[in-house]
């Protein structure tokens, strides 16, 4: 239903904001290298 979709959309927006606001330290989950402080993302983990 639309309520679930809105919630999901808001959640995704918040996640994107948190990722762009500050980088992830080594050991955190990542999808792209630029999400990590050292720009290293291997095996879905910051290196």
Curated annotation (Swiss-Prot):
Residues 1-22 form a propeptide. Disulfide bonds join 23-37, 30-41, 36-46. The modification Cysteine amide is found at residue 46. Keywords: Amidation, Disulfide bond, Ion channel impairing toxin, Knottin, Neurotoxin, Secreted, Toxin. The keyword Heme does not apply. One of its GO terms (cellular component) is extracellular region. GO terms for molecular function: ion channel regulator activity; toxin activity. It is found in: Secreted. Expressed by the venom duct. The keyword Disulfide bond applies. Belongs to the conotoxin O1 superfamily. The presence of a 'disulfide through disulfide knot' structurally defines this protein as a knottin. The cysteine framework is VI/VII (C-C-CC-C-C). This is Conotoxin Bu10. It comes from Conus bullatus (Bubble cone).
